[in-house]
């Protein structure tokens, strides 16, 4: 029998019952105050309109600032991604869920229909046709004219060089195209639509997985106020909105308070607390908001609200911070992080300069973000990935694991198909992404350890009650 009253998660998995004012100056204790019991009887499964895709959001302190962003506004330069890692569960998953239409996932060379190795000279092409076109252009080769319009395919492509070169030109290969590097978005969408249609016709199950992916994306967009697409546009200066105010030292922090309204914290001049503590508390408030957003998103994952209520709470307790740091990466580049819904940008060096232990909190998140961003996921990928994180059947204290694993198994299939369609050239992306789940758990563990240090050293500082409950007995 499922308990209908529990002392942990706010009503209806939101945070309506938790007052953000609990962080007032008069609350200076880390002791966990008992919560009143919460009635979960009002929880109901959301209505799914045709299984639709979703909105991402920053998980940072709510400060807002301004200044020259030029030196921070360059395109993201990221480090190499982590090497592929296969857990025992991953290997088992791959064995039991081999994609029956793998051959369909391989994009064909537009010239000879061999397997394309990538996007070369403006089109998808195999290594053979890429090299042939490059040699022809560089050496300025002229072939004997042929009027037979020879058919060019894998076995015959070397028989008539004239017709092969004409086919290269006909499908759109161009020496100038190499400078653009990536496929134009319109061309990419057209190609993916063609591939998806072929796959759906031959494998009806994939149509269901793509419908699930779309539903998760739509829910994601509705649940989170700042998507990765919006954040990257701000970070790279590709938006018509005003550039974010840059916080890089104490003076710019003071100036920022004159330009941006603080959502949770009164102006610096009216505060007796030092900046490090105030920034830390701002992060707490933003985290509480993020918990609410993630909870709303979780309720839209098909099957989640049908799980045991205690298990729903456990999954959220262990999953929310892993998701917070996943989505925080979207707001970061190697130099800093967007804050206040993109209105401000706080530099990495400034955060690192805060006194210990506060200066140690963000650096591991930056290190993770640089590598995670190298995977070049978009919001539709992230929507499925965070659902996979939530539905992790190995969380401590779960009462009924099987239905959780069944849901996650379906999500893993949807994620693998999504990555193959959205990143056809990144064959190891699925494995790399699963490795990031392990990295995220380590980051959360280190974060909890730092909180234990603060609990002992900062006697005049409080931790939000909801976060206290989440961190209690966490790793």
UniProtKB/Swiss-Prot annotation:
One term of GO molecular function: E-box binding
Residue ranges constituting the NR LBD domain according to the UniProt record: 208-473
Record comment: activity regulation: PDPK1 activates its transcriptional activity independently of its kinase activity.
Superkingdom, taxonomy of origin: Eukaryota
Covalent link location (Glycyl lysine isopeptide (Lys-Gly) (interchain with G-Cter in ubiquitin)): 222
Region (Interaction with FAM120B): 175-250
GO biological process terms held by the UniProt record: cell differentiation; cellular response to insulin stimulus; fatty acid metabolic process; negative regulation of cholesterol storage; negative regulation of inflammatory response; peroxisome proliferator activated receptor signaling pathway; positive regulation of DNA-templated transcription; positive regulation of fat cell differentiation
Coarse class of the protein's main subcellular location: nucleus
Localisation: Nucleus; Cytoplasm
PTM note: Phosphorylated at basal conditions and dephosphorylated when treated with the ligand. May be dephosphorylated by PPP5C. The phosphorylated form may be inactive and dephosphorylation induces adipogenic activity.
Name of the protein this chain belongs to: Peroxisome proliferator-activated receptor gamma
Residues recorded with modification Phosphoserine: 82
Gene3D superfamilies (UniProt xref): Erythroid Transcription Factor GATA-1, subunit A, Retinoid X Receptor
Domain notes: The 9aaTAD motif is a transactivation domain present in a large number of yeast and animal transcription factors.
Family: Belongs to the nuclear hormone receptor family. NR1 subfamily.
Residue numbers covered by motif 9aaTAD: 465-473
Function text: Nuclear receptor that binds peroxisome proliferators such as hypolipidemic drugs and fatty acids. Once activated by a ligand, the nuclear receptor binds to DNA specific PPAR response elements (PPRE) and modulates the transcription of its target genes, such as acyl-CoA oxidase. It therefore controls the peroxisomal beta-oxidation pathway of fatty acids. Key regulator of adipocyte differentiation and glucose homeostasis. ARF6 acts as a key regulator of the tissue-specific adipocyte P2 (aP2) enhancer.
DNA-binding region: 106-180
Subunit: Interacts with FOXO1 (acetylated form). Heterodimer with other nuclear receptors, such as RXRA. The heterodimer with the retinoic acid receptor RXRA is called adipocyte-specific transcription factor ARF6. Interacts with NCOA6 coactivator, leading to a strong increase in transcription of target genes. Interacts with coactivator PPARBP, leading to a mild increase in transcription of target genes. Interacts with NOCA7 in a ligand-inducible manner. Interacts with NCOA1 and NCOA2 LXXLL motifs. Interacts with ASXL1, ASXL2, DNTTIP2, FAM120B, MAP2K1/MEK1, NR0B2, PDPK1, PRDM16, PRMT2 and TGFB1I1.
Keywords: Activator, Biological rhythms, Cytoplasm, DNA-binding, Isopeptide bond, Metal-binding, Nucleus, Phosphoprotein, Receptor, Transcription, Transcription regulation, Ubl conjugation, Zinc, Zinc-finger
Pfam hit, one: PPARgamma_N
């Amino acid at each position: 029998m499922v308990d209908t009253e529990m002392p942990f998660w706010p009503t209806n998995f939101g945070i309506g019952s938790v007052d953000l004012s609990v962080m007032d100056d008069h609350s200076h204790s880390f002791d966990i105050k008992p919560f009143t019991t919460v009635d979960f009887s009002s929880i109901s499964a959301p209505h799914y309109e045709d299984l639709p895709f979703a909105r991402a959001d920053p998980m940072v302190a709510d400060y807002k600032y301004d200044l020259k962003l030029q030196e921070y506004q360059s395109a993201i330069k990221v480090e190499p991604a982590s090497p592929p890692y296969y857990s025992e569960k991953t290997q088992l998953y791959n064995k039991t869920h081999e994609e029956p239409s793998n051959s369909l996932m391989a994009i064909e060379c537009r010239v000879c229909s061999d397997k394309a190795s990538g996007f070369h000279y403006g089109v998808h092409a195999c290594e053979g046709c890429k090299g042939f076109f490059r040699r022809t252009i560089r050496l300025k080769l002229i072939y004997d004219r042929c009027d037979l319009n020879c058919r060019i395919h894998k076995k015959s492509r070397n028989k008539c060089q004239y017709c092969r070169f004409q086919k290269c030109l006909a499908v759109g290969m161009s020496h100038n195209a190499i400078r653009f590097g990536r496929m134009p978005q319109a061309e990419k969408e057209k190609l993916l639509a063609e591939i998806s249609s072929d796959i759906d016709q031959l494998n009806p199950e994939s149509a269901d997985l793509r419908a699930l992916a779309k539903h998760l994306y739509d829910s994601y967009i509705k649940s989170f106020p700042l998507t990765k697409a919006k954040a990257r546009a701000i970070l790279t200066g590709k938006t018509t909105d005003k550039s974010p105010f840059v916080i890089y030292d104490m003076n710019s922090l003071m100036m920022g308070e004159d330009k941006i309204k603080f959502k949770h914290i009164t102006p610096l001049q009216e505060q007796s607390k030092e900046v490090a503590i105030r920034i830390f508390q701002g992060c707490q408030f933003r985290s509480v908001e993020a918990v609410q957003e993630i909870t709303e998103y979780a309720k839209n994952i098909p099957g989640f609200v049908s799980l045991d209520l205690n298990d729903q709470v456990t999954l959220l307790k262990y999953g929310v911070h892993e998701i917070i740091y996943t989505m925080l990466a979207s707001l970061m580049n190697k130099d800093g992080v967007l804050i206040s819904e993109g209105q401000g940008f706080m530099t990495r060096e400034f955060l690192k300069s805060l006194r210990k232990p506060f200066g140690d909190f963000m650096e591991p998140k930056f290190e993770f973000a640089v590598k995670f961003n190298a995977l070049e996921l978009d919001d539709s990928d992230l929507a499925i990935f965070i659902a996979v994180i939530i539905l992790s059947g190995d969380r401590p204290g779960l009462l009924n694991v099987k239905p959780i694993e069944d849901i996650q198994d379906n999500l893993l299939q949807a994620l693998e198909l999504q990555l193959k369609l959205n990143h056809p050239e990144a064959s190891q992306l699925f494995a790399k992404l699963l490795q990031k789940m392990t990295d995220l758990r380590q980051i959360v563990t280190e974060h909890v350890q730092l909180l234990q240090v603060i609990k002992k050293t900062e006697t005049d500082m409080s931790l939000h009650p909801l976060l206290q409950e989440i961190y209690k007995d966490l790793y």
